[in-house]
Regions:
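Active-site-proximal alpha-helix that buttresses catalytic centers in soluble enzyme cores
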Residues: 2-84, 88-91, 114, 127-134
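Short aromatic-enriched loop/helix-cap "lid" or pocket-rim segments at secondary-structure transitions
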Residues: 15-19, 92-93, 151, 161-163
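Short, well-ordered coil/turn elements that cap or connect secondary structure elements
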Residues: 73-75, 102, 144
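A polyampholytic, Gly/Pro-enriched intrinsically disordered region
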Residues: 96-106, 148-156
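Non-DNA-binding regulatory cores of transcription-related proteins
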Residues: 99-106, 111-135
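Domain-level recognition of soluble alpha/beta enzyme cores
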Residues: 122-150, 155-160
Length: 163
Protein backbone atom coordinates (compact mmCIF):
# COMPACT_ATOMS: atom_id res chain seq x y z
CA UNK A 1 0.00 0.00 0.00
CA UNK A 2 1.07 3.55 -0.68
CA UNK A 3 -0.07 6.05 1.93
CA UNK A 4 -0.19 9.81 1.47
CA UNK A 5 -0.69 11.97 4.55
CA UNK A 6 -1.94 15.45 3.67
CA UNK A 7 -2.26 18.30 6.13
CA UNK A 8 -5.21 20.63 5.59
CA UNK A 9 -4.64 23.98 3.88
CA UNK A 10 -4.48 27.41 5.50
CA UNK A 11 -7.63 27.98 7.55
CA UNK A 12 -9.20 30.83 9.49
CA UNK A 13 -6.94 31.55 12.46
CA UNK A 14 -8.36 30.19 15.70
CA UNK A 15 -7.38 33.50 17.37
CA UNK A 16 -9.65 35.44 15.01
CA UNK A 17 -12.62 36.72 17.06
CA UNK A 18 -14.90 35.72 14.17
CA UNK A 19 -13.50 32.18 14.01
CA UNK A 20 -16.12 29.45 14.40
CA UNK A 21 -15.70 26.43 16.67
CA UNK A 22 -12.51 24.42 16.10
CA UNK A 23 -14.17 21.68 14.06
CA UNK A 24 -15.92 24.26 11.88
CA UNK A 25 -12.94 26.43 10.89
CA UNK A 26 -12.77 26.71 7.10
CA UNK A 27 -10.01 27.31 4.61
CA UNK A 28 -9.38 30.96 3.79
CA UNK A 29 -9.66 32.19 0.19
CA UNK A 30 -5.86 32.15 -0.01
CA UNK A 31 -5.85 28.71 1.60
CA UNK A 32 -8.20 27.41 -1.08
CA UNK A 33 -6.07 28.90 -3.87
CA UNK A 34 -2.77 27.55 -2.52
CA UNK A 35 -4.29 24.16 -1.69
CA UNK A 36 -5.65 23.88 -5.23
CA UNK A 37 -2.17 24.60 -6.63
CA UNK A 38 -0.61 22.05 -4.26
CA UNK A 39 -3.22 19.47 -5.29
CA UNK A 40 -2.36 19.98 -8.95
CA UNK A 41 1.32 19.49 -8.09
CA UNK A 42 0.42 16.31 -6.21
CA UNK A 43 -1.28 15.06 -9.37
CA UNK A 44 1.96 15.79 -11.28
CA UNK A 45 3.78 13.42 -8.89
CA UNK A 46 1.81 10.59 -10.49
CA UNK A 47 -0.27 9.95 -7.38
CA UNK A 48 -3.44 7.99 -8.09
CA UNK A 49 -5.09 7.22 -4.77
CA UNK A 50 -8.06 4.90 -5.00
CA UNK A 51 -9.27 5.93 -1.54
CA UNK A 52 -9.47 9.33 0.14
CA UNK A 53 -10.14 9.51 3.87
CA UNK A 54 -10.60 12.76 5.78
CA UNK A 55 -10.98 14.06 9.28
CA UNK A 56 -14.54 15.24 9.93
CA UNK A 57 -13.25 18.79 10.57
CA UNK A 58 -14.36 21.22 7.85
CA UNK A 59 -10.88 22.43 6.82
CA UNK A 60 -9.61 18.87 6.29
CA UNK A 61 -12.75 17.88 4.36
CA UNK A 62 -12.38 20.97 2.14
CA UNK A 63 -8.75 20.02 1.47
CA UNK A 64 -9.79 16.46 0.58
CA UNK A 65 -12.41 17.81 -1.83
CA UNK A 66 -9.87 20.10 -3.52
CA UNK A 67 -7.44 17.20 -3.96
CA UNK A 68 -10.26 14.96 -5.21
CA UNK A 69 -11.20 17.52 -7.87
CA UNK A 70 -7.57 17.82 -9.01
CA UNK A 71 -7.30 14.03 -9.24
CA UNK A 72 -10.69 13.40 -10.86
CA UNK A 73 -11.74 11.44 -7.78
CA UNK A 74 -15.51 11.29 -7.10
CA UNK A 75 -16.42 13.59 -4.19
CA UNK A 76 -19.08 11.18 -2.96
CA UNK A 77 -16.43 8.48 -2.48
CA UNK A 78 -14.43 10.48 0.10
CA UNK A 79 -14.68 8.68 3.45
CA UNK A 80 -14.77 10.44 6.81
CA UNK A 81 -12.87 8.95 9.74
CA UNK A 82 -12.89 9.99 13.39
CA UNK A 83 -9.38 8.45 13.57
CA UNK A 84 -8.02 11.51 11.71
CA UNK A 85 -9.23 14.04 14.29
CA UNK A 86 -6.41 16.06 15.91
CA UNK A 87 -6.34 14.31 19.30
CA UNK A 88 -6.64 10.72 18.11
CA UNK A 89 -4.02 7.99 18.45
CA UNK A 90 -2.01 7.52 15.21
CA UNK A 91 -2.40 3.75 15.55
CA UNK A 92 -6.17 4.11 15.06
CA UNK A 93 -5.94 5.26 11.45
CA UNK A 94 -3.40 2.52 10.72
CA UNK A 95 -5.82 -0.09 12.08
CA UNK A 96 -8.50 1.34 9.83
CA UNK A 97 -6.15 1.24 6.84
CA UNK A 98 -5.33 -2.41 7.49
CA UNK A 99 -8.91 -3.22 6.44
CA UNK A 100 -8.81 -1.05 3.32
CA UNK A 101 -8.63 -2.77 -0.02
CA UNK A 102 -7.01 0.21 -1.67
CA UNK A 103 -3.52 0.20 -3.17
CA UNK A 104 -3.05 3.96 -2.67
CA UNK A 105 -4.74 5.93 0.10
CA UNK A 106 -4.64 9.66 0.84
CA UNK A 107 -5.53 10.71 4.39
CA UNK A 108 -6.34 14.33 5.23
CA UNK A 109 -5.81 15.61 8.73
CA UNK A 110 -4.13 17.95 11.18
CA UNK A 111 -0.98 18.78 13.10
CA UNK A 112 0.31 17.52 15.42
CA UNK A 113 -1.61 14.29 14.74
CA UNK A 114 -0.07 13.78 11.30
CA UNK A 115 3.45 14.48 12.61
CA UNK A 116 2.89 11.83 15.30
CA UNK A 117 1.58 9.46 12.62
CA UNK A 118 4.70 10.07 10.50
CA UNK A 119 6.88 9.28 13.52
CA UNK A 120 4.84 6.16 14.28
CA UNK A 121 5.18 4.91 10.69
CA UNK A 122 8.92 5.57 10.78
CA UNK A 123 9.24 3.54 13.98
CA UNK A 124 10.00 6.34 16.40
CA UNK A 125 7.97 7.96 19.17
CA UNK A 126 9.16 11.53 18.84
CA UNK A 127 8.05 13.57 15.84
CA UNK A 128 10.94 14.46 13.54
CA UNK A 129 8.97 16.43 10.96
CA UNK A 130 6.55 19.30 10.79
CA UNK A 131 4.21 18.79 7.89
CA UNK A 132 3.26 22.19 6.49
CA UNK A 133 -0.31 23.15 5.63
CA UNK A 134 -1.21 21.49 2.29
CA UNK A 135 2.04 19.51 2.46
CA UNK A 136 2.16 15.79 1.65
CA UNK A 137 4.26 12.89 2.87
CA UNK A 138 4.34 9.52 1.09
CA UNK A 139 4.99 6.14 2.71
CA UNK A 140 5.01 2.72 1.11
CA UNK A 141 4.32 -0.48 3.00
CA UNK A 142 6.74 -3.30 2.23
CA UNK A 143 5.71 -6.91 1.75
CA UNK A 144 6.80 -7.51 5.36
CA UNK A 145 4.46 -4.80 6.62
CA UNK A 146 7.10 -2.16 7.37
CA UNK A 147 6.42 1.42 6.33
CA UNK A 148 9.12 3.20 4.35
CA UNK A 149 9.25 6.95 3.87
CA UNK A 150 9.33 7.69 0.13
CA UNK A 151 9.11 11.48 0.08
CA UNK A 152 7.88 14.57 1.87
CA UNK A 153 6.93 17.65 -0.16
CA UNK A 154 6.18 21.09 1.17
CA UNK A 155 3.22 22.95 -0.33
CA UNK A 156 5.65 25.35 -1.98
CA UNK A 157 7.37 22.48 -3.83
CA UNK A 158 4.02 20.96 -4.76
CA UNK A 159 2.88 24.27 -6.23
CA UNK A 160 6.12 24.52 -8.26
CA UNK A 161 5.47 21.08 -9.76
CA UNK A 162 2.39 22.52 -11.43
CA UNK A 163 4.16 25.58 -12.92
Amino acid sequence: MILYLVRHGVAIDRADPKAPAEAQRQLTAEGIRKTRQAALGFRECGAKPDALITSPYVRAAQTAEIFAEALGFPLDKIRVSEALKPAENPADILRELSHARAKEVACFGHAPHLDLTIAHLAGTRAPFSELKKAGVVCFEQSARGKWELRWLLSPKLLRKLND
